[in-house]
From Swiss-Prot:
Keywords: Glycoprotein, Glycosidase, Hydrolase, Signal. PROSITE patterns: GLYCOSYL_HYDROL_F31_1, GLYCOSYL_HYDROL_F31_2. It comes from Oryza sativa subsp. japonica. Pfam families: Gal_mutarotas_2, Glyco_hydro_31_2nd, Glyco_hydro_31_3rd. Residues 1-33 form the signal peptide. Belongs to the glycosyl hydrolase 31 family. Glycans are attached at residues 195, 378, 397, 467, 477, 576, 844. GO terms for biological process: polysaccharide catabolic process. InterPro entries: Gal_mutarotase_sf_dom, Glyco_hydro_31_AS, Glyco_hydro_31_C, Glyco_hydro_31_CS, Glyco_hydro_31_N_dom, Glyco_hydro_31_TIM, Glyco_hydro_b, Glycoside_hydrolase_SF. GO terms for molecular function: alpha-1,4-glucosidase activity; carbohydrate binding; hydrolase activity, hydrolyzing O-glycosyl compounds. This is Probable alpha-glucosidase Os06g0675700.
């Protein structure tokens, strides 16, 4: 039947394969295959075509419903780096992702200049993407103009029915194309593996399950090509903007989309670098929201805290152990009978909770609580009564849909209804008057439902069953019925995958309105563009060594999806962790963008101070994280303005190194901080891959690896240590470790200058108050400083300069750089000393040299610590360090 994967096209291995592929694409397809092009109108960058069902017969796979007989295709080069191709019913409107979810140009706005009989190729001198339509049978290709590399090459067997759409694109031979993305799933590898099906239907399935559809839907992939006509490391992106359920089948030499509704709305992003792809992608879907500075600290949570005294004991335990604790969280335990916007009057009464939160705030700490979408059906519950009065709940069969979640019977707000967002905002504001929480965690928003609603009509059980839960369960399983009706008559069938996005947006906007400060929202369910409003965590993982590794894969995937504030439950959520696993997990988790310890009720407690070995690891790893806070926050600025992930795969910085394409046991923070964690029990070493260049330890600043080509190195990994290195060519801004970020921000600044092999280095620093709603906006105060370093006079002189790009944040004018660490110095002979000049004036700075012993480079001088400086961050400076002989 047509629902099966098509036979993959020939793999282009040699002239015979090319010839056979040409025959395949030129074959006279019968009535059961695809469409023909009836007419074309176009200009050089816009095209419109009418497609008609081939042969006039009954079409393909009649068991899936009748084919739509006439289709409309629009293609437009919307920017120099973005191509939009949309295929829909020519005669009847169909559901599409709403404009207010992803604001985007209408295809019609690009088609005014088209003319009948226009060309069948879109190509401009400024765009690297070329679109070509082939007429009989219909198919289309997307090509990189600069190299001729075919990026997307559809086969002629397009299927378009009311509730089943299928399209296949061939791919280069396995080994040339490396694909990443298509989530949300827990995957064993970051790079997608062939012969796998990626199902997109938001579901409450624990993240400890591998290869199943989880909480979010992101029909986007990045393709990085190696060798061939495209050149090494050229990347592009493909988005199918569709909120309906789907299976995406990656067969190695092809990718097939099987979608149960909506339209085929494709966007192609030219890259060619991986960073350029995410820049172009987030230009369309929206830039990631700026996160408050404090959210980059360490967070502690547990499902199962018993009362306020339990919370107080945890906070005290961290303080006594001298382990940073930025944010305390509570799960649903704090609620009165699990009802949103309430406090348990016995265990978490307001007269105990308010002083507890006030004490956190006085100590520079924050408090976050969970809320769920289900509103308990209870006429004595004010939130329910107000929701009923405003008529904002999801409908089914003419009435409010009745589900069951933690508080029992519930109704669910319909966030497509404008009144629902207003209702939500008022409830949040009223709750914050009782308890001034600093952020909100929105959970169970797939929507999760403890009962399976029976099918009401055909859309509850469509003719094609996607691979829901890995066993093709009905789409109503553990959620609300697909036949439920949203505001405006929208079926849940179409809007299901949007619920988490819409709730996160409403929560973000409510916090912004109530506090006037930058919101912090953590959402379990996400969709394309959710990063504009929310952070995400990987969900209910398991306390296993496998999940420790898999957390890196999910973290890197969400960086591609435009949600850079991402992390996993440290030490594992489900099941009992072990001391060794927890120790190694905090070593990794300290470098997640979002770093939180969280565990399930009934499992062994795992606060980081409970085992001394874990506490040692936590102090060491979190101590380094807190020193790196200025760097992490600057990466947040980069993410907010360009879409760049905070945590990145190695190929983002080294796209020409094919060895990096399969690496998912290490990752980069930004462009040059490499984290190489231990991921197996009993290990005392770790084998890490180092791309070409110089790599310095971030613990003692010594040169650890110097290589002209990438190589694997076995490193010591003592029980309390995670290997973290910085690549030569980077300048990092550090501050002094403390137990809260507010204390860190008051400390002196250090510059780490890691010189590349050519003696140069660069870096950036972004500063603001960490909580203004805008980050680098016209109404906010902020400073941006660029640093550069270079050796002169054969290496005997090192110059470090700053350039103030923007300076309206007053504290930058008083922040002092007290030390500059120069890493990677070389000298033919040891110098007698150093002379230090600031802005041309010699200063009385102290200089110490060390770290040359055991260096992998000849002539290595090691590390020079230049202390006693008083350089002002917000004022440009020119620091010159001269070796004297």
């Amino acid at each position: 039947m047509m629902g099966s994967p098509p036979a993959p096209p020939a793999r282009r291995l040699g002239a015979l394969a090319v010839f056979l592929l040409a025959l395949f694409l030129a074959a006279p397809w019968g009535v059961d295959c695809g469409y023909n092009v009836a007419s074309v109108a176009g200009s050089k960058n816009r095209l419109r075509a009418r497609l008609e069902l081939a042969g006039g017969g009954g079409g393909a796979a009649p068991e899936l419903g009748p084919d739509v007989r006439r289709l409309s295709l629009t293609a437009s080069l919307e920017t120099d780096s973005r191509l939009h191709v949309r295929i829909t019913d020519a005669d009847h409107p169909r559901w599409e992702v709403p404009q207010d979810v992803i604001p985007r140009p209408s295809p019609d706005s690009f088609l005014a200049a088209t003319r009948p009989g226009g060309g069948r190729v879109l190509s401009t001198a400024t765009s690297d993407l070329t679109f070509a339509i082939h007429t009989s049978p219909f198919r289309f290709t997307v090509t990189r103009r600069s190299t001729g590399d075919v990026l997307f090459d559809t086969t002629p067997n397009l299927v378009f029915k009311d509730r089943y759409l299928e399209l296949t694109s061939s791919l280069p031979p396995p080994g040339r194309a490396s694909l990443y993305g298509l989530g949300e799933q827990t995957k064993r590898t970051f790079r997608l593996q062939r012969n796998d099906t990626f199902t997109l239907w938001n579901s409450d399935i624990a993240a400890g399950n591998v290869d199943l559809n989880l909480y979010g839907s992101h029909p986007f992939y990045m393709d990085v090509r190696s060798g061939g006509g495209g050149g090494g490391g050229a990347a592009h992106g493909v988005l199918l903007l569709n909120s309906n359920g789907m299976d995406v089948i990656y067969g190695g030499s092809y990718v097939t989309y099987k979608v149960i509704g909506g339209v085929l709305d494709f966007y192609f992003f030219a890259g060619p670098s991986p960073l350029a792809v995410v820049d172009q992608y987030t230009q369309l879907i929206g830039r990631p929201a700026p996160m408050p500075y404090w959210s980059f600290g360490f967070h502690q949570c547990r499902y199962g805290y018993k009362n306020v005294a339990d919370l107080e004991g945890v906070v005290a335990g961290y303080a006594k152990a001298r382990i940073p604790l930025e944010v305390m969280w509570t799960d649903i335990d704090y609620m009165d009978a699990y009802k949103d916007f309430t406090l348990d009057p016995v265990n978490f009464p307001a007269d105990r909770m308010r002083p507890f939160v006030d004490r956190l705030h006085r100590n520079g700490q924050k408090f976050v609580v969970i809320i769920d979408p289900g509103i308990n059906v209870n006429t004595t519950y004010g939130t329910f009564v107000r929701g009923m009065k405003q008529d904002i709940f999801l409908k089914w069969n003419g009435s409010n849909y009745l589900g069951v979640v933690w508080p029992g019977n519930v109704y669910f707000p319909d966030f497509l209804n404008p009144r629902a967002a207003e209702f939500w905002a008022r409830e949040i504001a009223a709750f914050r008057r009782t308890l001034p929480v600093d952020g909100l965690w929105v959970d169970m928003n797939e929507i999760s439902n403890f009962v399976d609603p029976p099918p009401l009509n055909a859309i509850d059980d469509p003719p094609y069953r996607i691979n829901n839960s890995g066993v093709r369960r009905p789409i109503n399983n553990k959620t609300v019925p697909a036949s439920a009706v949203h505001y405006g008559g929208v079926a849940e069938y179409d809007a299901h995958n949007l619920f988490g996005f819409l709730e996160a947006r409403a929560t973000h906007d409510a916090l912004l309105r109530d506090t006037g400060r930058r919101p912090f929202v953590l959402s379990r369910s996400t969709f394309v563009g959710s990063g504009r409003y929310t952070a995400h965590w990987t969900g209910d993982n398991a306390a296993t060594w496998e999940d420790l590794h898999y957390s890196i894969n999910t973290m890197l995937s969400f960086g591609l999806f435009g949600i850079p504030m991402i992390g996993a439950d440290i030490c594992g959520f489900g099941g009992n962790t072990t001391e060794e696993l927890c120790s190694r997990w905090i070593q990794l988790g300290a470098f997640y963008p979002f770093s939180r310890d969280h565990s399930a009720i009934g499992t062994v407690r795992r606060e980081l101070y409970l085992w001394e070995s874990v506490a040692r690891s936590a102090r060491k790893a979190l101590g380094l994280r807190y020193r790196l806070l200025p760097y992490l926050y600057t990466l947040m600025y980069e993410a907010h303005t360009t879409g760049a992930p905070i945590a990145r795969p190695l190929f983002f910085s080294y796209p020409g190194d094919v060895e990096t394409y399969g690496i998912d046991r290490q990752f980069l923070l930004g462009r040059g901080v490499l984290v190489s964690p231990v991921l197996e029990p009993g290990a005392t070493t770790v084998t890490a891959y180092f791309p070409a260049g110089r790599w310095f330890s971030l613990y003692d600043f010594s040169l650890a690896v110097a290589t002209k080509t990438g190589k694997r190195v076995t490193l010591p990994a003592p029980a309390d240590t995670v290997n973290v290195h910085v690549a030569g060519g980077n300048i990092l801004t550090l501050q002094q470790p403390a137990l809260t970020s507010s204390r860190v921000r008051q400390s002196v600044v250090h510059l780490l200058v890691a010189l590349a092999d050519d003696g140069t280095a660069t870096g950036d620093l972004f500063l603001d108050d960490g909580e203004s709603p805008e980050m680098a906006g016209p109404r906010s105060r902020w400073s941006q400083i660029k640093f550069s370093g270079a050796t002169e006079s054969g290496g005997g002189v090192v110059r470090v300069r700053s350039h103030v790009v923007h300076d309206s944040y007053a504290p930058s004018r008083t922040m002092a750089i007290g030390k500059v660490v120069l890493m990677g110095l070389r000298s033919a002979a040891p110098p007698k000393g150093f002379a230090v000049y600031a802005n041309g004036v010699q200063v009385n700075a102290s200089t110490a040299v060390g770290g040359a012993a055991g260096s992998p480079e000849k002539g290595a001088l090691g590390v020079a610590h230049v202390s006693g400086l008083t350089l002002v961050v917000g004022q440009e400076f020119d620091l010159k360090v001269v070796m004297t002989y």
